[in-house]
């Protein structure tokens, strides 16, 4: 499941408990990420799911749900 994989990657990258991560969680407001964290997260997700997220798309991503929906729309899963 995409959400589970995304959640694990976010927890690992940000050093937080995966149980804190919800679909509606904001990277900055809820999970305490900064802009560098988000760039590193996008890179890790691109590698894990073998996708490429253009910068203009990455700038629109603000929540976990945004990332999950983008990945689902751009993968075969």
Swiss-Prot record:
Record's comment on post-translational modification: 4'-phosphopantetheine is transferred from CoA to a specific serine of apo-ACP by AcpS. This modification is essential for activity because fatty acids are bound in thioester linkage to the sulfhydryl of the prosthetic group.
SUPFAM superfamilies: ACP-like (SSF47336)
InterPro entries linked: ACP, ACP-like_sf, PP-bd_ACP, Ppantetheine_attach_site
Residue numbers carrying O-(pantetheine 4'-phosphoryl)serine: 35
Gene3D superfamilies associated with the record: ACP-like (1.10.1200.10)
Pathway field: Lipid metabolism; fatty acid biosynthesis
Keywords: Cytoplasm, Fatty acid biosynthesis, Fatty acid metabolism, Lipid biosynthesis, Lipid metabolism, Phosphopantetheine, Phosphoprotein
Main location: cytoplasm
Subcellular location: Cytoplasm
UniProt domain Carrier: residue ranges: 1-75
Cellular component terms (Gene Ontology): cytosol; membrane
Gene Ontology MF terms in the entry: acyl binding; acyl carrier activity
Highest rank taxon of the organism: Bacteria
Function comment: Carrier of the growing fatty acid chain in fatty acid biosynthesis.
Protein name: Acyl carrier protein
Gene: acpP
């Amino acid at each position: 499941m995409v959400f589970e994989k995304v959640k694990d990657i976010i927890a690992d990258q940000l050093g937080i408990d995966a149980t804190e991560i919800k679909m509606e969680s904001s990277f900055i407001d809820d999970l305490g990420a900064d802009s560098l964290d988000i760039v590193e997260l996008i890179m890790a997700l691109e590698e894990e799911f073998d996708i490429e997220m253009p910068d203009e798309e990455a700038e629109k991503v603000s929540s976990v749900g945004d990332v999950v929906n983008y990945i689902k729309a751009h993968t075969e899963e």
